[in-house]
Swiss-Prot record:
Top-level division of the source organism's lineage: Eukaryota
Cross-referenced InterPro entries: Znf_C2H2_sf, Znf_C2H2_type
GO biological process: regulation of DNA-templated transcription
Positions of post-translational Phosphothreonine modification: T327
Organism: Bos taurus
Residues bearing PTM N-acetylmethionine: M1
Glycyl lysine isopeptide (Lys-Gly) (interchain with G-Cter in SUMO2) cross-link, renumbered residues: K188, K381
Record's keyword terms, sorted: Acetylation, Activator, DNA-binding, Isopeptide bond, Metal-binding, Nucleus, Phosphoprotein, Repeat, Transcription, Transcription regulation, Ubl conjugation, Zinc, Zinc-finger
Similarity comment: Belongs to the GLI C2H2-type zinc-finger protein family.
Function: Transcriptional activator. Activates the gene for selenocysteine tRNA (tRNAsec). In complex with HCFC1 and ZNF143, regulates the expression of several genes, including AP2S1, ESCO2, OPHN1, RBL1, UBXN8 and ZNF32. Binds to the SPH motif of small nuclear RNA (snRNA) gene promoters. Participates in efficient U6 RNA polymerase III transcription via its interaction with CHD8. In complex with HCFC1 and ZNF143, regulates the expression of several genes, including AP2S1, ESCO2, OPHN1, RBL1, UBXN8 and ZNF32.
Localization terms from the record: Nucleus
Protein name: Zinc finger protein 143
Molecular function terms from GO: DNA-binding transcription factor activity, RNA polymerase II-specific; RNA polymerase II cis-regulatory region sequence-specific DNA binding; zinc ion binding
Length: 613
């Protein structure tokens, strides 16, 4: 038998919103009342007194009083319904809808000592064992302990549905017990079971049995509670009852928790902070914090189950996207006429669309920087150039790096370790409020190499990999003071890929006709198409590998000469690809190689990535 009761005790409380009033703390839990063999005497349980209530069947229930402040416990009194409707009406006039599993015929009136009537629900039978259930604000069971017998799943379901009802009512300023949360003291709600006198802690294991199946065709997913099933069904129905009230937003969510997390994108609140030494990151949700902590611990609990793969991931969403590399599924299609590309993840799709729109909405807020990015993840990773932090460690030799991709390159070259490193966690890269509204078109991609140890390069080569996306190709010094431009018309003769040059100027992936390579102290590289057709020759002169002296470009049918002279000492490093070798590709910023490896890998697979794709 279940008895809902309020106890004015401030311990163990869970916060519920109060609809404009002060937040009210309500905790739902399941505890043990004390029974005595003769039924006449009552024992005290840790200073808590119990009032006997005789039920209709002759058995005895107990109403708990809080002896700390001398106030009696409050039990919501409701009138006995005269009809067979599907709701009960509280004393304040509020109608409470009963869940499907609540049968009014199982509701029993209890006459209290003051002559009023309380309601007790007998819909579920609870085993007579040592049992405690702690029901959280989101309606889930946090802890479960049983003696020799297991808790009936119907019991868990009924309690969770009751908790969900309390949560909904509480959001309107009324708790599930019908008590208005104005300036009253913080309250504690309990569900009291008549059972054994032994008390146990609530820090226990949940059974985890999934007894609630989705009935929609082709789904059949199982859930541990009716409440979770109901939330899941909203993914089929599209029901989003929780709407953001921020001016101009209007987004809606399937759960109250989803709305609460979203509101923080407007307020900028990030209450969940990483406790790791030297880490100052904070997050909007505890789930995002948990995912972030795995970057410190190395935990990857989500494994790919495809035979022969064996990769594991920090989040289930990343695993889901990864599995599509096995299945070939690409559910997100670009609707731009003539494009026809498809993507495995929604994030990559949205980033791709910005290639067509030219949008670069994410701007670096560091004074004097003002760099812009198509992807928030690029901005997120760009921030590392403004810090001295090197958070990524090599597990072989202990070297530290600013970027995951630089670490990956080091492990491949120094330790022959080709194990993939997870480079992006989409859940971390959500734009903060106020970003994403500006547009900057006609940007460029910069191809660079990484110089191991310093994460710095001295020369950048800017180009594009898709015609019509930029007005020029630029060979530019790192400080931006000197450059050589190649026009858009000349660009079309280059093709979509160029060859690679090592740091000492030696070409790696040049065409078979080595005549394009000049000698006599000068090094050159032919910019070729994917088929190996020569489109343009760019001559690079590196004298004693110390000074970068001259760069010239020779175009197909027209000859253009440009000269770049500097006395600064800067090693020569240029990169590109035509044979599928993974390279570093920099998105118009200081050396950050995250996007580089990703884009190079896609080039290797025969794709033609766009600006920031």
């Amino acid at each position: 038998m279940l008895l809902a009761q309020i106890n004015r005790d401030s311990q163990g409380m869970t916060e519920f919103p109060g609809g404009g009033m002060e937040a009210q703390h309500v905790t739902l839990c399941l505890t043990e009342a004390v029974t005595v063999a003769d039924g006449d005497n009552l024992e005290n349980m840790e200073g808590v007194s119990l009032q006997a209530v005789t039920l209709a069947d002759g058995s005895t229930a107990y109403i708990q009083h809080n002896s700390k402040d001398g106030s009696a416990a409050y039990v919501q009194h409701v009138p006995i319904p005269k009809t067979t409707g599907d709701s009960l009406r509280l004393e304040d006039g509020q109608a409470v809808q009963l869940e499907d599993s609540y049968d009014q015929s199982a509701l029993q009136a209890v006459q209290l000592e003051d002559g009023t009537t309380a309601y007790i629900h007998h819909a579920v039978q609870v085993p007579q064992s040592d049992t405690i259930l702690a029901i959280q604000a989101d309606g889930t069971v946090a802890g479960l302990h049983t003696g020799d017998a297991a808790i009936d799943p119907d019991t868990i379901s009924a309690l969770e549905q009751y908790a969900a009802k309390v949560s909904i009512d509480g959001s309107e300023g009324v708790t599930g017990s019908g008590i208005i949360g104005e300036n009253e003291q913080e309250k504690k709600m309990q569900i009291v079971l008549q059972g054994h006198a032994t008390r146990v802690t609530a820090k226990s294991q949940q059974s985890g049995e999934k007894a609630f199946r989705c009935g929609y065709d082709g789904c059949g997913k199982l859930y541990t509670t009716a409440h979770h099933l109901k939330v899941h069904e909203r993914s089929h129905t599209g029901d989003r009852p929780y709407q953001c009230e921020h001016a101009g937003c209007g987004k809606a969510f399937a759960t109250g928790y989803g709305l609460k997390s979203h509101v923080r994108t407007h307020t900028g609140e990030k209450p969940y902070r990483c406790s790791e030494d030297n880490c100052t990151k904070s997050f909007k949700t505890s789930g995002d914090l948990q995912k972030h902590i795995r970057t410190h611990t190395g935990e990857r609990p989500f494994k790919c189950h495809f035979e022969g793969c064996g990769r594991s991931f920090t989040t289930s969403n990343i695993r889901k996207v990864h599995i599509r590399t096995h299945t070939g599924e690409r559910p997100y299609y670009c609707t731009e006429p003539g494009c026809g590309r498809a993507f495995a993840s929604a994030t990559n799709y949205k980033n791709h669309v910005r290639i067509h729109t030219g949008e670069k909405p994410y701007v670096c807020t560091v004074p004097g920087c003002d760099k812009r990015f198509t992807e928030y993840s690029s901005l997120y990773k760009h921030h590392v150039v403004h810090t001295h932090s090197k958070p990524y460690n090599c597990n072989h030799c202990g070297k530290t790096y600013k970027q995951i991709s630089t670490l990956a390159m080091h492990k491949r070259t120094a330790h022959n370790d080709t194990e993939p490193i997870e480079e992006e966690q989409e859940a971390f890269f959500e734009p903060p409020p106020g970003q994403g509204e500006d547009v900057l078109k006609g940007s460029q991609i910069t191809y660079v190499t990484g110089v191991e140890g310093d994460d710095v390069v001295s020369t950048q080569v800017a180009t594009v990999t898709q015609s019509g996306l930029s007005q020029q190709v630029t060979l530019i010094s790192q400080d931006g003071t000197q450059h050589v431009n190649i026009s858009q018309a000349d660009m079309q003769a280059i093709g979509n890929t160029i060859t690679m040059v090592t740091q000492d100027g030696t070409p790696i992936t040049v065409p078979a006709h080595d005549a394009v390579i000049s000698s006599a102290g000068a090094h050159s590289v032919a910019m070729v198409t994917a088929e190996g057709t020569e489109g343009q020759q760019v001559a690079i002169v590196a004298q004693d590998l110390a000074a970068f002296h001259t760069a010239s470009s020779e175009m197909g049918h027209q000859q253009h000469s440009h000269h770049l002279v500097t006395t600064e000492t800067r090693p020569l490093t240029l990169v590109a690809t035509s044979n599928g070798t993974q390279i570093a590709v920099q998105l118009g910023e200081q050396p950050s190689l995250e996007e580089a490896i990703r884009i190079a890998s896609r080039i290797q697979q025969g794709e033609t990535p766009g600006l920031d794709d």
